[in-house]
Amino acid sequence: MSANTENSTIALTADAGSDQNLIVEEFLGHAKADLDPAVIEKVQNGEQVEGVTAYARGNYYKISANPTSPDYIEPFDIHLHFQDGPTVLEGVNGATNEALLKVLIHRTKILDSQFPSEHNKQAIAA
C-alpha cells in the first residue's frame, strides 16, 4: 500500500508479478485509512468494504523500478489503465490488451533488427 497525503487517502495495491528489478502492482482502490490485510483480501475477492472505493480488477497497474535492486539507476513509474467494459457501452476509457500487444510486437521487431534471435522471431510469429 502507498499513501497519498495530498488527498489523505491510501492506495490499495497488490503485487502482480514483481521481481528483483521491477515492482509490478495492481491498484485495487483507495481508502481514507490504513486497512488490515484481511480487509484488503476482501477487496481482492471482489467484496464491498465500507470506506473503500474499489476499482474493477485487472484495469489499473503500476510498474516501477525496485530501489533495492543491484541494477537500480533511477526511479520511474509506468501507469497502465486498461479498458473497463465494452467500448460500445462504456466508450474508450483505457488501453486494450491488443494495443499493448502491438507495442510489445513493435518493440520486439526493433530489438530483433538490432539483435537477431530465434526467440524474437518466434514471439513475433505467435
Model-identified regions with their sequence ranges:
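Short acidic, glycine/tyrosine-flanked loop/strand segments centered on an H-E-D-like triad
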Residues: 80, 92-111
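Short, compact, well-ordered microdomains
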Residues: 102, 108-126
